[in-house]
From Swiss-Prot:
Family of this protein: Belongs to the bacterial ribosomal protein bL31 family. Type A subfamily.
The encoding gene: rpmE
Cofactor(s) the record lists: Zn(2+)
Protein's name in the database: Large ribosomal subunit protein bL31
Keywords: Metal-binding, Ribonucleoprotein, Ribosomal protein, RNA-binding, rRNA-binding, Zinc
Origin species: Methylacidiphilum infernorum (isolate V4) (Methylokorus infernorum (strain V4))
Entry's Gene Ontology cellular component terms: ribonucleoprotein complex; ribosome
Cross-referenced PANTHER family: 50S RIBOSOMAL PROTEIN L31, CHLOROPLASTIC (PTHR33280), LARGE RIBOSOMAL SUBUNIT PROTEIN BL31C (PTHR33280:SF1)
Binding site for Zn(2+): C16, C18, C36, C39
Quaternary organization: Part of the 50S ribosomal subunit.
Length: 80
C-alpha cells in the first residue's frame, strides 16, 4: 500500500440525542446522530412518534396560504 494517501483512521465517539454514547473507529473525530438503538421504537418496543411533522405538512403549513398562478382564491366563475 502507498503511504500518506489514506485518511487517518482513529477512535471516535458517536453521540445520540437521547444521551447514549458509543465508541467505534472512523475517519471523523466525533459523530452526532438523532436516533440510535437505545431510543429507536423498533428496538425498545415502545411506540412513540419520532417525526413531529412530515415534510409535506411543513410545506403546507409554510406555503398553504399562497395561491398559485391560474388558481383563484375567492373569485367565483362567471356562468353564461
Amino acid at each position: 500500500m502507498k503511504k500518506d494517501i489514506h485518511p487517518n483512521y482513529q477512535e471516535t465517539t458517536i453521540s445520540c440525542a437521547c444521551g447514549a454514547v458509543y465508541t467505534t473507529k472512523s475517519t471523523k473525530p466525533s459523530i452526532r446522530i438523532g436516533i440510535c438503538a437505545s431510543c429507536h421504537p423498533l428496538f425498545t418496543g415502545q411506540q412513540k412518534f419520532v417525526d413531529t411533522a412530515g415534510r409535506v405538512e411543513k410545506f403546507a403549513r409554510r406555503f398553504g396560504k399562497i395561491s398559485f398562478i391560474g388558481e383563484s382564491s375567492n373569485k367565483k366563475k362567471k356562468t353564461k
